């Protein structure tokens, strides 16, 4: 899973460490990277390279790429899954005891409504979930969740392995839907709030974000795969590669 990444303190970021800033804590990793490509950090709409790295470190999916062998899918927020005999349905069992950065427990509703939110907002990465034949109109007939179970169906002649890869993608990230809805403004589905805050289960949570300047993360001590080594990560924008 992500244990290797946690041990290396967010080595998922393919970045270069910068000289330490004044008063930087010993357990903080300071990184210099060009982050002005970021348009949004809401996982429902994030589509750029840098925002994708951010999403990877703050959110989880039901299944995830193994940290050691990235061609292998491993359990994430789901501990296991069963494929029906006709290869048309996958039933996921959610991991017990997982909490969001807010402290709210992970529920099947969070999974289902996070995916629906992607389709409703219809940002650039929505087509990835749309590959499964999911639309705002078809979603309720294809995805359901109750208790610790999420059931997924799809249209098209896809192998279940393709479906699992879609569900391991960043737009399939699960958000704390209760918290997101509490911060909805003018029907934006919490989009503005998620551009300044995180609402995931990932190894790090967002402390602050100043576009094209700095993005600061802090470790999640309750992360289900183990507490990250580094207490904080500061990603400072540096435009020229030669100055990194």
Language-model features, listed with the residues they occupy:
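Bacterial N-terminal signal peptides
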Residues: 7-16
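Sec/Tat signal peptide C-region and signal peptidase I cleavage site
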Residues: 18-22
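Short, well-ordered beta-strand elements
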Residues: 26-35, 79, 89-91, 111-115, ...
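N-terminal lobe/hinge region of extracytoplasmic solute-binding protein
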Residues: 32-85, 116, 197-203
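Gly/Pro-rich hinge or "lid" segments in bacterial periplasmic/extracellular proteins
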Residues: 66-67, 168-228, 242
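Aromatic- and charge-enriched surface segment that lines or borders ligand/interaction sites
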Residues: 80-125, 151
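Surface-exposed binding/hinge segments that line
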Residues: 93, 131-183, 208
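Short helix-initiation/N-cap motifs at beta->coil->alpha
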Residues: 137, 199, 234-244
